[in-house]
A protein has these predicted regions:
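Alpha-helical transmembrane segments and their helix-start/interface "positive-inside/aromatic belt" motifs
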Residues: 15-35, 121-128, 227-233
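Transmembrane helix recognition focused on a "late"/terminal membrane span
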Residues: 1-9, 27, 31-120
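Central hydrophobic cores of alpha-helical transmembrane segments in multi-pass inner-membrane proteins
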Residues: 8-16, 204-205, 209
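Generic hydrophobic-segment detector
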Residues: 3, 7-9, 14, 198, ...
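A structural signal for multi-pass alpha-helical bundles of membrane permease subunits
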Residues: 44-54, 60, 91, 123-430
């Protein structure tokens, strides 16, 4: 039996490849060494200058574009981080292989054996490499750039290339709390965003589940007709529906005030002659937005829930009937738990989606009416406030990036807690 020293193999791997060569995996060792040589050449020729520019963000206005330097630096930083992960994996690999050799476990030595081992044991990982590469540059890279911008002074007074950007640390985050204008705006917008996400999402979920339960009842005739009707809000493009309903809620000539309310006034006399300020009063605008999202969002929940209901065995309901359970007890103990067990991730995603539902806020009333300071309208949510911060006459890109990071932290934290509490991905008990 061979006697390898794992600590010696790990120590030799400080120069990638040497530990593998020590373990008599020469093919792997030379590949690791080759990767390192290529990286060193790349780092000296390309990455090092760009990372230096990332730190300084330029020193001569007009010639140096700080924003481009930041983006290019972030791009090369990804490759450096990937190599660092490879570097430490190389040390761990040498140490692990040495221990396996000492334990008499066969290890691939030749290039042919290594390829065979990768094909037999690592083929699934090879298939997902393109996905990881795409995710890195489509998701992680923009996130890194946004994160970096949040720590700069990128605004209308510092627009590259005529002006240089500077690193300002946590200034943008502290300004949200220290500057009265931004503090009041952030508090108002955040509170409305939370109310909006909870109210609108809950409404569309309740309507969707309710209509699905009704449509699934055996005594309902013409189920296909009901299905088509319930899917209409989903079939029409959302932006068309939003613009149409926005016109219907017009204070003076909208169909709601001129036609619907007079009809309701015959049943509800207190509505006689009422003209509700849907578009000019923030409270009524918020109510209209919540109702509209309930209408737009429930068809998806309806389709999802209907499929779940049709998969629930009738034996459960028959047993509950024999035990004397009423309709509410059947729903609470059978129907709702089954819906929640299957659809919990989707239901949670409705809340996260509405937390960032920009289109309805922008198309319905442009975030108005009125303003709460800091460039935010009275019905702006965080994502639409970010839009205002970046497209206004005095854009605040770094502040918008800071708010974006705050949104991300809130959404990710709440989603992870909800997934964990609801055991959203635990399907063993379904």
């Amino acid at each position: 039996m061979e006697n390898q020293q794992p600590s010696k193999a790990a120590l030799l791997s400080v120069i990638p490849g040497l530990g593998q060569i020590y373990n008599k995996q020469k093919a792997k060792g030379f590949i690791f060494l080759g990767v390192t040589i290529v990286f060193v050449l790349y780092f000296l020729a390309l990455a090092a200058p760009e990372l230096h520019n990332l730190i300084t963000l330029g020193d001569k206005p007009g010639r140096d574009n700080s924003l481009f330097m930041l983006i290019r630096g972030a791009f090369h930083l990804i490759f450096v981080v990937v190599y660092v992960l490879f570097y430490f994996s190389n040390i761990k690999d040498a140490h692990t292989i040495a221990k396996r050799i000492n334990n008499g476990i066969p290890v691939p030595r030749t290039f042919k054996d290594m390829i065979k081992g990768i094909y037999e044991n690592g083929f699934p990982y090879l298939l997902i490499i393109p996905s990881y590469v795409a995710m890195t540059f489509a998701i992680i890279f923009p996130v890194i750039v946004t994160l970096m911008i949040a720590f700069t002074n990128y605004d209308f007074q510092h627009l590259p290339p005529n002006k240089l950007l500077d690193w300002v640390g946590l200034t943008n985050f502290t300004n949200i709390w220290s500057l009265s204008t931004f503090r009041s705006a952030f508090g108002a917008v955040l509170s409305w965003t939370i109310i909006w996400a909870l109210s609108a999402s809950t409404l569309q979920i309740v309507i969707g589940i309710f209509t699905a339960i009704i449509a699934n009842q055996p005594f309902i005739k013409g189920k296909r007709i009901f299905g088509v009707i319930f899917l209409l809000p989903w079939a029409v493009p959302a932006f068309i529906t939003i613009l149409t309903i926005s016109n219907m809620f017009n204070d003076s000539v909208g169909a709601i005030n001129t036609q619907v309310l007079p009809i309701l006034a015959k049943v509800l006399p207190f509505l006689d002659g009422a003209l509700i300020p849907w578009k000019t009063d923030p409270t009524w605008t918020k109510i209209a937005l919540i109702m509209m999202q309930g209408w737009l969002g429930f068809p998806y929940i309806y389709v999802l829930t209907l499929g779940i209901l049709q998969s629930i065995p009738n034996d459960l309901y028959e047993a509950a009937y024999i035990d004397g359970a009423n309709a509410w007890q059947k729903f609470r103990n059978i129907t709702f738990p089954m819906i929640l067990a299957v659809a919990a991730p989707t239901l949670i995603s409705q809340y996260t989606f509405n937390f960032n539902n920009f289109s309805i806020m922008y198309l319905f009333n442009g975030g108005g009416p009125g303003s709460v300071g800091g460039g935010a309208g009275s019905t702006d949510i965080l994502i639409s406030w970010i839009y205002r911060l970046t497209t206004g006459t005095s854009p605040q890109y770094s502040m918008a990036a800071a708010v974006t990071l705050i949104i991300s932290i809130i959404v990710i934290s709440i989603s992870m807690i909800a997934f964990k509490k609801l055991h959203a991905f635990d399907m063993e008990d379904v």
